[in-house]
Amino acid sequence: MTEQRPLTIALVAGETSGDILGAGLIRALKERVPNARFVGVAGPRMQAEGCEAWYEMEELAVMGIVEVLGRLRRLLHIRADLTKRFGELKPDVFVGIDAPDFNIILEGNLKKQGIKTIHYVSPSVWAWRQKRVFKIGRATDLVLAFLPFEKAFYDKYNVPCRFIGHTMADAMPLDPDKNSARDVLGIPYDAHCLALLPGSRGAEVEMLSADFLKTAQLLRQTYPDLEIVVPLVNAKRREQFERIKAAVAPDLSVHLLDGMGREAMVASDAALLASGTAALECMLAKCPMVVGYRMKPFTFWLAKRLVKTDYVSLPNLLAGRELVKELLQEECEPQKLAAALLPLLANGKTSHAMHDTFRELHQQIRCNADEQAAQAVLELAQ
């Protein structure tokens, strides 16, 4: 930052979640430095906050090996061009938002040119391919981490890291309104309610839906009034789920929802879900849960050898113990899933204790992440 020009921040976001984070960061920085300039790779939200887009975010938003290989030449061209243009611009700080396969190499290129670099959102280095931490350490001046155990991991390897809390924890209330959520979904206040969330990817929905539906059938025998809500992320997943349901449980009445995962969690007495971000969101919704997950046998065999953590779900990683039951692979079958869910639907001591711990964990990661991230950027820009 010099007298001649405003604070200049370069950013690269590669997908919608990064665009949301980038927009929140830009908003928080503009409150402190109104004339700051923002340039880079941005989605519509970042652009709405005033970020000048040298490339559209969609250019980087490719998933799957085949898709990446098909776009590889273009991706390499974009990275080389950004390395050159950011090198000429000399921004006060570069912030790579998630998209580690693209951003960490770019961060390393820029750091060699004397540009300060931040990687916002830690890759899951604490879980697998842990040696990536050394590459991240060489490429960045600072990592911004959502979760406290991530910072503890970086500290172990002397890689500068700041725990800023989780934006989702900031966005969700400490005490969600269950009755309001039930009003929205048309669920009676006095009914038992179960949310089924079989994942957002096609492979997950294919692997888990049948067992989740059979579990719901078993639970309905104990709770005849059981309302079952199934939020699905898009029309393709809904169509896939409906096909599986027609084959497995055609007579089971359920509420199929387009999106509305958060409302379903808040409204429910218990949830059965695939692991991933949904488990964190469910914890923040204060909905007691069971995690069920299944993958192809070879993939599971490989994962067991690569993954270095005792648990797969974020609530358990945050708690440092099995707070939430995880039933994986052969264990992920209807009888065991139903047995784990029954005490949660009873809404007694087990679910109350889980709810209280969820609230404590929510408070731990509710730190106003946008503000914390902005503060970290400004400190590095000094």
UniProtKB/Swiss-Prot annotation:
Pathway: Glycolipid biosynthesis; lipid IV(A) biosynthesis; lipid IV(A) from (3R)-3-hydroxytetradecanoyl-[acyl-carrier-protein] and UDP-N-acetyl-alpha-D-glucosamine: step 5/6
MF terms (GO), sorted A to Z: lipid-A-disaccharide synthase activity; phospholipid binding
Catalytic activity: 2-N,3-O-bis[(3R)-3-hydroxytetradecanoyl]-alpha-D-glucosaminyl 1-phosphate + UDP-2-N,3-O-bis[(3R)-3-hydroxytetradecanoyl]-alpha-D-glucosamine = lipid A disaccharide (E. coli) + UDP + H(+); a lipid X + a UDP-2-N,3-O-bis[(3R)-3-hydroxyacyl]-alpha-D-glucosamine = a lipid A disaccharide + UDP + H(+)
CDD domains: Glycosyltransferase_GTB-type
Enzyme class, first EC level, given as a word: transferase
This enzyme's EC code(s): 2.4.1.182
Pfam families: LpxB
Signal sequence interval, chain numbering: none
Keyword field contains Transmembrane helix: no
Task performed by this protein: Condensation of UDP-2,3-diacylglucosamine and 2,3-diacylglucosamine-1-phosphate to form lipid A disaccharide, a precursor of lipid A, a phosphorylated glycolipid that anchors the lipopolysaccharide to the outer membrane of the cell.
Alphabetized NCBIfam families for the sequence: lpxB
Protein name stated in the entry: Lipid-A-disaccharide synthase
Organism of origin: Escherichia coli O157:H7
